[in-house]
Structures are given as structure tokens and as C-alpha cells.
Amino acid sequence: RIYREYMPDGYPIVNEQNRTDLMAAYLQSHTTVPVVWRYDVLRSQARQNPERLLYYKTDTHWNSIGALIGLDGIFEALDMQTLSPDAYPVEADGTTTGDMANVAALYASLPAEETYTVPGYAQLFEKDGRAVRVIGDSFSEYYMPYLQARFTNSWREHIDTFTMDVVDHPGCDILILEFNERSLDKLLAILEAF
């Protein structure tokens, strides 16, 4: 939905709200836990800077810039300093082929996509001494370098491999649960335990 204007006309938008919109709104109004849902910011940035992609064209994931915009929402919920998305110094730093191109065996015929970095990111902000544990899907991989630059101690566990003992013994100061829409059923199962 971030780049919906690029979809073929034969694929109309059926619903303006999806499951994630509904769940985020529900959790924001029925819990005291900070719920970060950055769709509007990502969509706005995609429209303002169409040449600087936030998601890969041949991959189901956001790139490192989209991930940083998403992670900044978490930092803001923690009352931590961030920059506006346009203020980060972004540089191209290589190329990659996307997971969908690889699965479809089109990696040789589709052009490689640029990857980006924010040079000097670790020096932009003071290091935080708290420990951060991320339980998330593959999208969280893309923001871990930024998280590791901001915190003294941080680690990530995939939603398919962590154990529910985290409910009673989180082992961290900050627990981030990160899920994309495909994994909402897993998020619901985890939330039932809290």
C-alpha cells in the first residue's frame, strides 16, 4: 500500500483499511502499551521522495531507510531523539536482489536494487545504556544496525524461535514486538499470554 499508485489498474484498492490498521487502532485505544504504526509517515515519505525508495521493488521487505523511519516511531514512543526522515544523510552503498526475484528465479533478468546507508548514524545520538530485546519477523533485521548503534545491548529473536518465558522473564529494559501483517496471528497468540 505504500506504493499503491504503481499497481496495475486491474488491481483495484478494495479496502482503505487493512487488518493491521484495525489492530493498531484497537490496541492504541484499548491498552496502555505504546503501539507504533508508521503507515502514514512511510506513505508520506514515499510520495515526497519517490526517487528514494523505502521498500525494495523485487522484495517483500522495506529497505534500511524504510526500516529507520519505522524504528524512529519506536524511538519517539520511548521519548528518544530522532531526526525528520529528510534530515538523515542517505547514501547508496551497494546492490541486492530481492527475495521475490530470487524465488521466481528472475534475479538474472531483473536489475539489481540499490541498498542504502546512513553514514555516521552511530555518532548522531548518544548511546543509551538500556537493554533492548526484539521479538520480530524478518522486517526487524533491517533496523537492527540502527538499534545496535543507539543501545549498548540489543538482540533480536525471530517470532518462530523465541519461547513464551519472555512473559515472566523478559531479560531486558525494553521489549519490542514487531510483526508485519502476515504474522498478525502470531502476535495475537503472544498477546494472549501477557
What does each of the following model-derived ranges do?
Residues 1-194:
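Extracellular glycan-modifying ectodomains
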